[in-house]
Regions:
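N-terminal export leaders
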Residues: 7-8
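N-terminal soluble segments of membrane proteins
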Residues: 11, 15-16
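N-terminal secretory signal peptides that target proteins for export/translocation
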Residues: 1-4
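Extracellular receptor-binding modules and their adjoining Ser/Thr/Gly/Asp/Asn-rich linkers
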Residues: 25-78, 89-100, 105-137
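Cysteine-dependent deubiquitinase/ubiquitin-like isopeptidase catalytic cores across multiple families
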Residues: 83
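C-terminal segment of classical bacterial N-terminal signal peptides
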Residues: 17-24
């Protein structure tokens, strides 16, 4: 009898944990914004629609600057958190040396990103890289 009660308690606790996790993930979906942006600054995918356009300014052999301009009203205030990561894997140099970084503090109007390639044998390597951007309220 004690065994059945313990099993029942574990099942109920597990169900509550799953239900609360589902609620948290549903709420998190409302507060996270993601985008895939090409090395030329074209937005390939975004969820939800939160990016108006991207200004791309390449600096040959050094870095590429991207200003991601946000849709009006996407953020009432500056994002609480943003992260960026290079997704180019065309060569081993891209895998090992390509980097993307936030360039300054994100605002409710824009997020600045730079991409560059460090340690490459080619000093004139293309610094423009495709990247994924994620911001959260």
């Amino acid at each position: 009898m004690l065994y059945r009660r313990n099993v029942l308690i574990r099942l109920i606790a597990g169900g509550l944990l799953l239900a609360s996790g589902h609620k948290v993930s549903a709420e998190a979906a409302n507060f996270s914004y993601t985008a895939l942006i090409t090395s030329q600054g074209k937005v390939l995918a975004q969820s939800p629609v939160w990016i108006s356009y991207v200004n791309h300014a390449p600096r040959a052999g050094y870095f590429s600057d991207y200003k991601v301009v946000l849709e009006e009203g996407a953020f009432d205030r500056s994002p609480g958190f943003c992260a960026v990561s290079v997704v180019d894997v065309d060569s081993l140099d891209d895998v090992f040396y390509a980097q993307a970084k936030l360039s300054g503090t994100p605002t409710r109007h824009s997020v600045k990103v730079i991409t560059h390639q460090i340690g490459s044998a080619d000093p004139q390597a293309n610094a423009s890289k495709s990247f994924m951007l994620m911001c959260a309220k």
